[in-house]
């Protein structure tokens, strides 16, 4: 885990080091709110575990979240940034059948405590191919490092599956200034492949509070997963999001 943090912050340092006078603006984007589970289906191992739901068969309580993004804008159309987006959801309950999970068997009816963690570290680049007074549209690519963990604990038994890996994504953004200081923002990363899929998309209303601060409120969806011999996991996570973008 320490190596993962070191790697991410080294890359972030490279981005910061690139911020010379050629950069016209630095943005700090902070976001918080409430996160709650849609579906969250798991089978570990993918070819022999018990398929169960962390949200339908167990109870997943809503929780708070936060995300931090730093963005450098230069040459009008080019943007480079870094994102830290931690996510953690805890579930409790019982199953009416034995649970085979990551090499351990939990008897039916046992009170279960499950933890779902999916932290995300990203570096991205975007080029705005359309920039008008009312509308901006851009696209690029994202390099994502996922730090995932699913764990189950009950009656002195505990088992977990940890997965840390690299995921390439397509980055996109649409900003529509539809009325005075109000704008609609659609911003996200997404990609689908035979190995799995991932989507992280925000639809939000922006209000230009001043030249230095934009306020935002909206709905974010994080969805995706993978299906292979080691793991089957597909989740839909919903966010009620509030935040601010500070322009320096």
Give a label for each model feature:
Residues 197-247:
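Predominantly the C-terminal beta-signal and adjacent terminal strand-loop region
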């Amino acid at each position: 885990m320490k190596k993962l943090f070191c790697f991410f912050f080294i890359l972030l340092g490279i981005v910061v080091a690139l911020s010379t006078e050629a950069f016209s603006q630095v943005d700090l984007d902070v976001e918080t709110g409430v996160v709650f589970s849609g579906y969250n289906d798991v089978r570990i191992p993918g070819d022999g575990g018990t398929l169960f739901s962390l949200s339908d068969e167990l109870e997943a309580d809503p929780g708070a979240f936060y995300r931090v993004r730093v963005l450098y804008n230069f040459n009008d159309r080019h943007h480079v940034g870094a994102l830290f987006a931690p996510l953690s959801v805890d579930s409790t309950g019982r199953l009416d059948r034995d649970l085979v999970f990551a090499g351990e068997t939990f008897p039916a009816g046992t009170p279960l405590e499950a933890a779902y963690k999916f932290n995300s570290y990203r570096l991205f680049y975007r080029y705005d191919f359309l920039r008008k007074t009312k509308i901006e549209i851009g696209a690029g690519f994202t390099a994502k490092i996922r730090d995932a963990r699913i764990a189950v604990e009950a009656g002195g038994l505990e088992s977990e599956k940890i997965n840390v890996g690299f995921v390439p994504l397509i980055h996109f953004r649409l900003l529509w200034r539809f009325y005075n200081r109000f704008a609609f923002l659609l911003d996200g990363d997404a990609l689908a492949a035979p190995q799995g899929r991932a989507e992280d998309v925000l639809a939000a209303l922006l209000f230009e509070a001043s030249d230095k601060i934009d306020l935002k409120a909206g709905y974010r969806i994080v969805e995706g997963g993978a299906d292979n011999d080691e793991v089957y996991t597909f989740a839909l996570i919903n966010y009620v999001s509030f935040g601010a973008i500070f322009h320096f």
